[in-house]
């Protein structure tokens, strides 16, 4: 897979994984689904669902460290800044040979790494972010996509990024 292929697939994900409506209950359901998937697989991840800059769901599973908490914050900041997945932002920066600092951002506050995904509502746009941290960045991204696909009854096989 090339960066261009991944960026194209992520754009498809961001379009397909949009909600008709999204509220506090939906946010909780999404967070709980991620927690269940991670627990079943023995994954030590931090999970955050933020809606309108308000934390709605947070869980830290066994194995999470304070570093993961900071990664969640920094990845979420990328989504809330650019309204696209943190992984797509990182891939685009890599493709262009740039850093977040080149865009006037502080790397201590913005992490262009996989694991945060915009919560998009059709006709409205980005209203928040769902973020995980604890796995390699591509796996973090794919886990979030899997949970969104399950919630929205979308075919994961057509959306998931292929393994490297």
Curated annotation (Swiss-Prot):
One of the Pfam families matching this protein, by short name: HbpS-like
SUPFAM superfamilies membership: GlcG-like
InterPro entries tied to this protein: PduO/GlcC-like (IPR005624), PduO/GlcC-like_sf (IPR038084), YBR137W-like (IPR010371)
Family: Belongs to the UPF0303 family.
UniProt xrefs under PANTHER family: PTHR28255, UPF0303 PROTEIN YBR137W
Name of the protein in question: UPF0303 protein RHE_CH02903
Origin species: Rhizobium etli (strain ATCC 51251 / DSM 11541 / JCM 21823 / NBRC 15573 / CFN 42)
